[in-house]
């Protein structure tokens, strides 16, 4: 379990929040159309909205304190398009990190600066979470030391004394059943994506199925013209992109795991002898049925807790190591048998020898 914890939670000191101007440019969100009338381009404009905004802006730059917000110059238009009575950013479009934000206070009633917001966000959400390449994981999963189970945002710091509104985040409180289902789907997809990338086991089938389901739900809501709020706009852009962009990557990863499993089974057959192939165990390994059951047991209306994620990850580790430990055990028992009867051939093809010499899991480079 300790290895699982190390895998799930990186040391916060290893995350560097300082970026060059070039790197910052790559994380800028797409701008909302400046036309006063809302049009369908708004949907495509959110395509990059999940590119996690971990940049630390200086006072010369406009500040976007949360990944859900576009750049400050588009704030008024964006919020107006949502139409939820949010803070009127049109009167203060050029806020800097050091200037206090009027009417936006913390729990003590003190006006705060954008720098305070960023510091709060980084302390509570970024430094304590896994690999910073997983933008959705930051946004959509709670942490053991930060108990709220909705989107990871500092709601207490976004209170408007004048209206009592929380800006676009009021949308979260009034989601329809379909919208809540989509949001939960997104959480689950984020988890599967992170596990596939970092916890050494493939979730290709689940990811593709969830993406398809999410896209179908979005299309259904659009047809019925019942979609409301910025959350659904984000989901439209996300599912439309994710369902196609991940397919090739996950199919390749799935193919790699299937090939690896075939190789391990071949090694087992070579070194354990025919009597080592127990049909019941072979079925469990071949189908990895127990692994899928662990994931499918997560109900869609429940947000996985950290302890659940750790538990599932530990189960994944056990399933992955099952074949290797089984092979090792059969090798030991096979060595005893060889003293009594002729030993089977111990020659290994070069490809298998190379495979055995590799580390258990091949790290995947994050693009």
UniProtKB/Swiss-Prot annotation:
Nucleotidyltransferase in keyword set: no
Taxonomy, superkingdom: Eukaryota
Naturally occurring in which organism (per UniProt): Yarrowia lipolytica (strain CLIB 122 / E 150) (Yeast)
An example Gene Ontology molecular-function term: DNA binding
Family as reported in the entry's similarity comment: Belongs to the TALE/M-ATYP homeobox family.
Keyword Transcription on entry: yes
Localisation per UniProt entry: Nucleus
Cellular component GO terms held in the UniProt record: nucleus
Residues within the DNA-binding region(s): 273-338
Swiss-Prot/TrEMBL keywords: DNA-binding, Homeobox, Nucleus, Repressor, Transcription, Transcription regulation
Quaternary structure note: Forms a heterodimer with A1.
CDD domains per the UniProt record, alphabetical: homeodomain (cd00086)
Function: Mating type proteins are sequence specific DNA-binding proteins that act as master switches in yeast differentiation by controlling gene expression in a cell type-specific fashion. Transcriptional corepressor that acts in conjunction with A1 to repress transcription of haploid-specific genes.
Protein name: Mating-type protein ALPHA2
